[in-house]
């Protein structure tokens, strides 16, 4: 009889938010103000829709049907972009802003890469199911029959294309296909339970995700490489106090952008690491 995996095998560094470290990391993300605001608002509605209902009752009392359509979206958000585009850092820290915004505690559960398993029969399905079961149990503690949620859960899945890749691939192993099925069942269980929980996925291969997963996403945020203006902001924050003048910074902005021999500019991590 197979053993249930322990929490250390399922999650990497579970965190309770708000947290000063996460707040500081989020503040250091440059050029992402629009994405931070959009993601925080989407997660806030999915985790704690009571605030939106209160606003609707006050300003648009006859818009209940529209509000239900917004609130009933599956609790799944996908962040897609190149490696180093900042999506994982944002995913790991955005819960702090949501926690402060909604005035609740958020439990961040980063799904461990080891949860993919080693290919043994039934292993991946059991690991994914156990992760969702624990997240469901935690979120159920915060559920409120009436009024605002008492807390929330974010289940973070990095490198999601390795876990929820398309089942349409002819090369896909049966075990992987079963794992994707378990993943979709987990998302649907969150949605049907009306829990204060959301699945936040990061991928650099959006088209590799299973179509059923993409269809369930309440929102998909695409991360591009930083523009010249954004590169200048990053560089000036890092180097401005070190004596780099305007001409020096502009030269670095140009050097980190597209070149005749390179059809793409630097990512955020290329510049900062």
Please provide the spans of the model-predicted regions.
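Compositionally biased, intrinsically disordered low-complexity regions enriched
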Residues: 1-10, 49, 54-55, 104, ...
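Short, flexible segments with low predicted structural confidence
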Residues: 9-11, 184-185
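Charged, amphipathic alpha-helical linker segments immediately N-terminal to NTP-binding catalytic cores
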Residues: 11-50
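Walker A/P-loop NTP-binding motif of AAA+ ATPase domains
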Residues: 34-40, 51-250
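N-terminal accessory segments that target, anchor, or regulate ATP-driven/P-loop NTPase machines
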Residues: 1-6, 26, 89-90, 156, ...
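Generic alpha-helical structural element
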Residues: 28, 87, 263-267
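Conserved AAA+ ATPase small/helical "lid" subdomain
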Residues: 244-273
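Short hinge/gating elements
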Residues: 19-28, 77, 220, 258-260
């Amino acid at each position: 009889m197979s053993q249930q995996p322990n929490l250390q095998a399922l999650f990497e560094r579970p965190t309770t938010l708000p947290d000063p470290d996460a707040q500081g990391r989020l503040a250091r993300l440059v050029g992402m103000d629009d994405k931070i605001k959009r993601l925080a608002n989407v997660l806030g509605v999915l985790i704690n829709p009571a605030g939106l209902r209160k606003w609707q009752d006050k300003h648009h009392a006859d818009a209940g049907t529209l509000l239900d359509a917004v609130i009933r979206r599956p609790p799944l958000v996908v962040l897609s972009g190149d490696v180093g585009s900042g999506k994982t850092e944002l995913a790991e820290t955005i819960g702090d802003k949501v926690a402060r915004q909604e005035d609740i505690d958020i439990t961040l559960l980063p799904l461990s890469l080891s949860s993919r398993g080693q290919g043994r029969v039934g292993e991946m399905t059991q690991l994914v199911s156990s992760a969702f079961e624990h997240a469901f149990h935690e979120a159920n503690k915060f559920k409120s029959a009436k009024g605002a949620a008492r807390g929330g859960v974010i289940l973070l899945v990095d490198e999601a294309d390795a876990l929820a890749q398309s089942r349409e691939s002819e090369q896909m192993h049966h075990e992987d296909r079963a794992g994707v099925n378990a993943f979709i069942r987990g998302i649907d269980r969150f949605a049907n339970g009306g829990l204060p929980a959301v699945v936040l996925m990061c991928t650099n291969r959006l088209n590799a995700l299973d179509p059923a997963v993409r269809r369930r996403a309440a929102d998909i945020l695409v991360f591009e490489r930083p523009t010249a203006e954004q590169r200048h902001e990053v560089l000036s924050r890092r180097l401005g106090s070190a004596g780099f003048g305007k001409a020096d910074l502009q030269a670095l902005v140009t050097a980190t952008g597209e070149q005749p021999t390179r059809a793409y500019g630097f990512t955020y991590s290329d510049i900062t690491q």
